């Protein structure tokens, strides 16, 4: 199958990026190196091409749109204000995830769902399957370009670029702005644990934005960042990734995103199983693990208790550039998922000591804008 290309594809190649297939797209995995890009984002700022993500617009009668969205997601849409972004999940009939998403509320009759690159077609089809009432669903991804500007200096860079104070955009909020003759969406969100923005524009303006931000960001230490460092950054922040910590079988509670699960007056898809997990606790759940012996955690390594009983497996793993040790996420039987519990990870036939760590591995600058 031929890989899709973002509007920045030729620019990535000109910049010397190493390209890899990802979710059906040909994407940059690194430019100068994963560690350098990771540390630059933590210390200064990084710019990411995320225009492979999907944008789905849900519009129609206010009551019908709200009822529909509430019926297919596990977080509470009704509490959202205009200009707010919400982390949520589209759920299936058995309580698993079709995808984790961000929901943007423009007004009572218009919402946007941002979904993962590999899942936005599945999300669109799932929404169309259950749509009812006066509601329209439009997968408008081909007309939108998305750039993420992340890091403690992201605000200063984008403020200088726009010539506009951005302090009014709070964490998990967005504003529509007129820029270069078109409406763009500026959202204070991200996938790194750092302060920053996700910026939605037309494809043409997205290319211009990329070039100009890199130029104006030179004095701030801004660097282009590929998918490799995007993954290590999200893992340090303990953000889940679909196909690793999230899938069609595990409930959001099992996947470690219990905080987005809400009880509602009308049940949503998979409601009984999801709420039972929230109330009674799941049999297994995703937590962080830190390796205490030499080695590097990767996905699907079996994990054992001290008595030799197999209790779970890793779902993601890496060598953390910030902490200079191997960190990972894992699904463990709940009794072993408590903070500082000692477990053993099997790496190449050897069982190595590790400890469970709850909470983020690295606390980035995102906390400064809560």
From Swiss-Prot:
It catalyses: N(6)-[(R)-S(8)-aminomethyldihydrolipoyl]-L-lysyl-[protein] + (6S)-5,6,7,8-tetrahydrofolate = N(6)-[(R)-dihydrolipoyl]-L-lysyl-[protein] + (6R)-5,10-methylene-5,6,7,8-tetrahydrofolate + NH4(+). InterPro entries: GCS_T (IPR006223), GCS_T_bac (IPR022903), GCST_C (IPR013977), GCV_T_N (IPR006222), GcvT/YgfZ/DmdA (IPR028896), GcvT/YgfZ_C (IPR029043), TrmE/GcvT_dom1 (IPR027266). Keywords: Aminotransferase, Transferase. GO terms for cellular component: cytosol; glycine cleavage complex. It is an enzyme of class 2 (transferase). One of its GO terms (biological process) is glycine decarboxylation via glycine cleavage system. Pfam families: GCV_T (PF01571), GCV_T_C (PF08669). GO terms for molecular function: aminomethyltransferase activity; transaminase activity. Its EC number is 2.1.2.10. The glycine cleavage system catalyzes the degradation of glycine. Belongs to the GcvT family. NCBIfam families: gcvT, PRK00389.1. The glycine cleavage system is composed of four proteins: P, T, L and H. This is Aminomethyltransferase. It comes from Leptospira biflexa serovar Patoc (strain Patoc 1 / ATCC 23582 / Paris).
């Amino acid at each position: 199958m031929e890989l899709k290309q973002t509007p920045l594809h030729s620019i990535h190649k000109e910049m010397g990026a190493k390209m890899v297939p990802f979710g059906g797209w040909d994407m940059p995995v690194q430019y100068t190196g994963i560690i350098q890009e990771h540390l630059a984002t933590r210390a200064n700022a990084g710019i990411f091409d995320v225009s492979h993500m999907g944008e789905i617009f849900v519009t129609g009668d206010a009551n019908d749109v709200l009822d529909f969205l509430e019926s297919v997601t596990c977080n509470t849409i009704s509490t959202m204000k205009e200009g707010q972004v919400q982390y949520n999940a589209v759920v299936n009939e058995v309580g698993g995830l079709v995808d984790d998403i961000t929901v943007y509320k423009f007004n009572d009759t218009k919402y946007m769902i941002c979904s993962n690159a590999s899942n936005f077609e599945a999300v669109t089809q799932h929404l169309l399957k259950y749509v009812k009432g006066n509601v329209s669903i439009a997968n408008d991804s081909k007309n939108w370009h998305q750039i993420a500007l992340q890091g403690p200096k992201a605000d200063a860079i984008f403020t200088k670029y726009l010539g506009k104070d951005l302090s009014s955009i709070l964490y998990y909020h967005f504003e529509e702005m007129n820029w270069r003759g078109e409406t763009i969406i500026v959202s204070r969100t991200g996938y790194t644990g750092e302060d920053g923005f996700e910026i939605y524009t037309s494809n043409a303006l997205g290319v211009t934005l990329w070039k100009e931000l890199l130029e104006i960001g030179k004095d701030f230490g801004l660097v282009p960042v590929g998918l490799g460092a995007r993954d290590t950054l999200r893992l340090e922040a303990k953000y889940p990734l679909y196909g690793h910590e999230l899938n069609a079988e595990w409930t959001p509670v099992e996947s470690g995103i219990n905080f987005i699960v809400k009880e509602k007056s009308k049940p949503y898809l998979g409601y009984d199983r999801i709420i039972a997990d929230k109330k009674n606790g799941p049999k297994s759940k995703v937590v962080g693990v830190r390796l205490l012996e030499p080695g590097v955690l990767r996905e699907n390594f079996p994990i054992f208790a001290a008595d030799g009983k197999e209790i779970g497996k890793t779902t993601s793993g890496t060598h953390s550039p910030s902490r200079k040790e191997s960190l990972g996420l894992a699904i463990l039987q709940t009794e072993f998922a408590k903070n500082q519990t000692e477990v053993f990870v099997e790496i190449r036939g050897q069982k190595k000591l590790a400890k469970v760590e709850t909470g983020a591995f690295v606390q980035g600058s995102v906390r400064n804008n809560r």
